[in-house]
Amino acid sequence: MNNQTFTLQPFPSNETLPNLQITGSITRHHNQLTINYHLMGDLKAVVIPPLSNTQTRKHELWEETCFEFFLGIKDSAQYWEFNLSPAGHWNAYHFHGYRQGMTEETAFSVLPFDVNQSDDLSLVVNIDLSQIISAKQTLEVAITAVIKHSNDTVTYWALTHCGVQADFHLRDSFMIDL
């Protein structure tokens, strides 16, 4: 089993940002991947969509507050992007290379995850990767978040920011090996 903790950093900005922190952990046990996200701080400054009664696959979740992760196979250009909304909606996309050949990943018909909100917001996803990769393949992972603020500004959070603009697809930012 491989377990690591993480802290996300906002893309550098000249704007004053609300007092927020995004931390969590990621674990891979055989081909089960579990990611725990924790958003803490001034949540009143964040637009958090209400939890829906039905979790559905939706596009463009990254236009609102959304937790994301990217999975790449070591020594391969292909990768997957997973989007998880605090409302319970989700999507998964497959790419053949950097921002190339984006298609909805049909190996997943559901992507169940849990969302809890009190003084902070937590989201936990547990996914069986057997449908897309072998347990013997090494994963390169990027963990990210898009935070929409109550003043309609958006901030982009990641383990690291490798470009001159926020770009979660840059392979250099897939920093966690599992």
Residue ranges, per PLM feature:
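Beta-strand elements of well-folded, non-transmembrane domains
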Residues: 26-28, 39-43, 73, 127-131, ...
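Beta-strand-rich interaction surfaces with strong enrichment in secreted/lumenal proteins
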Residues: 22-26, 108-116
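Extracellular/luminal beta-rich ligand-recognition
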Residues: 55-108
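Beta-strand secondary-structure signal
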Residues: 23, 34-38, 68, 122-126, ...
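Acidic/polar low-complexity flexible segments
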Residues: 58-65, 73-79, 135-178
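Solvent-exposed loop and beta-edge segments used for protein-protein assembly and interaction
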Residues: 16-18, 27-33, 61-63, 76, ...
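Order/disorder boundary and secretion-linked terminal/linker segments
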Residues: 1-50, 58-60, 159-178
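Surface-exposed extracytoplasmic segments
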Residues: 112-129
